[in-house]
Design a protein with these regions (language model features):
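Long, charge-rich, low-complexity intrinsically disordered regions
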Residues: 1-317
Length: 317
């Protein structure tokens, strides 16, 4: 836990409050927290410590100079801790499904009861079977865990479950590896981050189909469906009887969580280039500072561009 908090603190812009750091770690469902996490490339820390109490958080900050970091927590700019965990659960379920069906056992209890995960795995499983890609799947799985191991000790393999092969619990793994469960959690977090980078590398035709995006808030999901139906932001605001600012927050969440990447719809390319050239030299400032330099851009447009840059969707040519 301490390594995670210290990493968040080191990654946080100077003007941000301790409360904003805490909100990211516990996963506060607010659009400001989503933006804070994305703009500081801390999305993979979002909701990583949901049970953390604020007094404990403050106590650690007071004694941070006494804490000697023994490992580095890796970060991912595109996926929340929940979505990384769900992606691994999908891999667990796919491995379980492939292993059991190869033994003609179709009555096994799925390792994950999450409907979204089950639906995704079903699609990928059918894709493998219809295209006779069993060997390709096994090779990708082997290469994935080999790549994770190269970036540091890998413990995720303990949690795979096959036919007549139950998975280990974290307590069992901690005893086997002689690590505390907290140390193990932090190593597993790094394993998940490496896994997500690997899956997006272009080397995993099958397993990349199983990536689980962060979940959208309910009202944001409604806005997302309306945008897909080609309604304008103004139309959606009128339909939902809310201010346009609310829909702007929804759009930012949609971009942050990777459901759309249509930045050109919100900011002209010439404005994008001018701002991003400036931004990469002045990262970590307050929005007001950027607004003073680019008065023709709205705060919403500034946030859109910052999200695109920090996610790696927009680059300076």
């Amino acid at each position: 836990m301490q390594h995670i908090i210290k990493t968040a603190l080191q990654q946080t812009f100077n003007y941000k409050t301790n409360k904003s750091i805490y909100n990211i770690l516990v996963g506060k469902k607010s659009h400001q927290t989503f933006f804070d996490a994305c703009s500081q490339q801390q999305l993979s820390l979002y909701h990583s410590l949901p049970l953390l109490k604020y007094p404990s958080f403050e106590l650690f900050l007071e004694n941070i100079t006494e804490f000697n970091a023994e490992m580095e927590i890796m970060l991912h700019p595109r996926y929340t801790f929940e979505s990384m965990g769900q992606t691994f659960q999908a891999i667990q379920l796919l491995v379980q499904t492939m292993s059991n069906t190869m033994q003609q056992d179709f009555r096994f209890v799925p390792i994950s009861q999450n409907n979204k995960i089950q639906e995704t795995v079903k699609i990928v499983y059918n894709y493998i079977k219809e295209n006779k890609l069993q060997i390709d799947f096994e090779n990708e799985l082997h290469n994935l865990f080999k790549a994770i191991t190269l970036k540091g000790p890998c413990y995720l393999h303990y949690y795979l479950q096959g036919y007549d092969e139950p998975m280990y619990t974290r307590q069992q793994v901690s005893l086997i590896e002689k690590l505390s469960q907290q140390q193990l959690f932090e190593y597993e977090m790094n394993n998940l981050v490496t896994m997500m980078f690997e899956l997006k590398s272009g080397e995993y035709t099958i397993l990349s189909k199983i990536i689980m995006k962060p979940t959208l808030l309910n009202q944001t999901y409604i806005t997302y469906t309306r945008l897909l139906e080609q309604f304008t932001m103004e139309d959606i605001a009128a339909q939902q009887q809310v201010k346009i600012n609310t829909i702007e927050d929804h759009v930012l969440e949609i971009l942050i969580k990777g459901y759309m990447s249509n930045y050109d719809d919100y900011v002209e390319q010439e404005d994008q280039l001018q701002f991003l050239n400036f931004y990469q030299q002045h990262r970590g400032e307050r929005l007001k500072f950027y607004k003073e330099q680019f008065d023709t851009l709205s705060y919403f447009q500034l946030k859109v561009l910052i999200v695109g840059f920090e996610r790696g969707d927009l680059n300076v040519a």
